Amino acid sequence: MSEMATIARPYAKAAFDFAVEKGELSQWAQMLTFCSEVAKNEDVAQLLDGAIASEQLAEIFISICGEQLNEFGQNFINVMAENGRLKVLPGVLEQFILLQHEFEKVIDADVTSAIELTEQQKADIGAKLEARLERKVKLNCSVDETLLAGVIIRAGDLVIDNSARGRLGRLSETLQS
């Protein structure tokens, strides 16, 4: 997976820089999202693995994408096809989104709780994280009943384990040392 990220990173950076320069960040994110989904399609994936010339492959890919690609998006697909890199489009999208979030000062935060959080609790957690991280926070909430109570928050390198399971684990470690 890290090899795909290494290959995808320069393409994502080039697309990102171009999108910022043209003021078309959201349009490029939409184009790359669509192209990524096309590249993940089973039939298209078989085409990408086949022995088709890069020009033909680019033409086929662009025709599948149709109106979803503007002129610059089509050029981007042509360059990727010439270099045999259309298979890494999902990785390009991933890297592009990371760059976009960094640029827009947005961070994804995974919040795992023992029970479903209310809208007010989500708003409170989001506000506190935004103040602490000085970024806009996008919450991804999930439920894990094995936590017993409380929440675990993961945002970038930050991990806050305020679950009953986590507290019991730390208490157990303290008692054993």
UniProtKB/Swiss-Prot annotation:
UniProt entry keywords in alphabetical sequence: ATP synthesis, Cell inner membrane, Cell membrane, CF(1), Hydrogen ion transport, Ion transport, Membrane, Transport
Any Gene Ontology CC annotation: proton-transporting ATP synthase complex
Keyword NAD found: no
GO molecular function terms attached to this record: proton-transporting ATP synthase activity, rotational mechanism
Location within or outside the cell: Cell inner membrane
PROSITE patterns: ATPASE_DELTA (PS00389)
Signal peptide as annotated in the record: none
Gene3D superfamilies with a match to the protein in the record: N-terminal domain of the delta subunit of the F1F0-ATP synthase
InterPro entries to which the protein is assigned, alphabetical: ATP_synth_OSCP/delta_N_sf, ATPase_OSCP/d_CS, ATPase_OSCP/dsu
Recorded topology in the membrane: Peripheral membrane protein
Function: F(1)F(0) ATP synthase produces ATP from ADP in the presence of a proton or sodium gradient. F-type ATPases consist of two structural domains, F(1) containing the extramembraneous catalytic core and F(0) containing the membrane proton channel, linked together by a central stalk and a peripheral stalk. During catalysis, ATP synthesis in the catalytic domain of F(1) is coupled via a rotary mechanism of the central stalk subunits to proton translocation. This protein is part of the stalk that links CF(0) to CF(1). It either transmits conformational changes from CF(0) to CF(1) or is implicated in proton conduction.
Complex formation: F-type ATPases have 2 components, F(1) - the catalytic core - and F(0) - the membrane proton channel. F(1) has five subunits: alpha(3), beta(3), gamma(1), delta(1), epsilon(1). F(0) has three main subunits: a(1), b(2) and c(10-14). The alpha and beta chains form an alternating ring which encloses part of the gamma chain. F(1) is attached to F(0) by a central stalk formed by the gamma and epsilon chains, while a peripheral stalk is formed by the delta and b chains.
Family statement drawn from the similarity comment of this UniProt entry: Belongs to the ATPase delta chain family.
Protein name: ATP synthase subunit delta
Biological source species: Aliivibrio fischeri (strain ATCC 700601 / ES114) (Vibrio fischeri)
